[in-house]
Amino acid sequence: MLLWCVIALQNRVTVEVSAALSREPFLYGKTPPSLNFSSELRLQPFGNSCFLPQKKNRIFRGHIVTFFFFIAYLFPLYYNRDIVREGGPAMKIKELLDSPKVTISCELFPPKKGTELQNAMDIVHAIAIDGVDYMSVTYGAGGTAVGKSLAIASEVERSGVPALAHLTCIGAKKDGIARVLRDMKAGGIDNVLALRGDRPQGMDELPESDFPHASDLVRFIKETGDFCVGCATYPEGHPESRTLDEDLENMKRKVDAGCDFLVTQMFFDNEMFYNFMYRLLAKGVRVPVVAGVMPITNAKQVERIFTLSGTPIPSKLRAVVERFGDHPEALRQAGMAYTTGQIMDLIANGFNHIHVYTMNKPEVIGGIRRTLSEVIKL
């Protein structure tokens, strides 16, 4: 690019000077010398056998243009010499979670259509303005949206907010995962949520993979680069686990492999979560746990969530849905109030780190932060 600019500038200056000489003949019938970019720099007014002094000013202006082209070329290289966010050095999420400060984070997912990517970027900036401590970005089923996911996560970092990039390993090979990790580092991403990933529909057996379990992925990430690694946890137990104790053992294996913190799947019953935390601590798991909540905004959403999880709807939430389910705006307000109450109860009981599943709706996180503005400051 820089070479092209210099060549173009050279040709322009040569043509301008040659044209000037043809308009202003040299005295004594002298033939103008052959001019090129380098020789023009040495020509000075000398008697009657040189072009007029103002032609040198044209060349000088050409040098100024070249200089600014050169600066424009070097600036991005200098600016990106280290992977940093606009808000400062890249931050490890574990540093946030190790503090007593209340943190509010949220989850984003990439659009299904590439044409909607700009809308996702606009959502990133809208949420960044409202203020969150970090944003997680999902990976798509089987990593199908990896390019869009990394683009969004990099945009999150550029907005001044730490990004937590999801990474699934189901059916993955080590070289493929290593390539994605390199792309993450190049995009300024230092935080990864390591997941096995969902079993493909219609498959009884898991596809062949270098990472049979999420703990294998955690270990590989820690060996590969300087990443802060989180993992998912299920307060009601993973759907594929036979018992909650079996699931808790899996959590411990992830932590032993190097997991820095855990983020729960969404739950709607705080008492169930507190019981889960007691049992997790009894297993010796001491990493920070981020509580995941999601405001209910429509009745069908409730049915789908609890059908997939295989758990019963808490009686308090069922009452809300039954009373307001036929009135969308009323249900939206009631759902936000239910989640806000959950968050207040969690913080009051010492669980200061909250992750909100927003379904890509900036107004959700904005509403929660405004309602709990004084609570969050504590």
Tell where the protein language model's regions lie, with residue ranges:
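Active-site mouth loops of central-metabolism enzymes
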Residues: 105-119, 164-175, 230-246, 324-337
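Active-site beta-loop-alpha junctions enriched in small/polar residues
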Residues: 108-111, 138-142, 166-172, 197-199, ...
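Active-site-adjacent beta->alpha loops and helix N-cap segments on the catalytic face
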Residues: 93, 117, 143-154, 173-179, ...
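Conserved, mostly hydrophobic/aromatic
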Residues: 107, 135, 184, 254, ...
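Polybasic, lysine-rich low-complexity intrinsically disordered segments
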Residues: 11, 30-31, 36-37, 48-51, ...
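Active-site pocket-lining/capping segments in soluble small-molecule metabolic enzymes
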Residues: 208-234, 284-336, 341, 371-378
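N-terminal amphipathic alpha-helix/helix-capping segment at the start of soluble metabolic enzymes
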Residues: 88-106, 113, 378
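Short, Lys/Arg-enriched N-terminal segments with co-localized hydrophobic residues
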Residues: 55-90
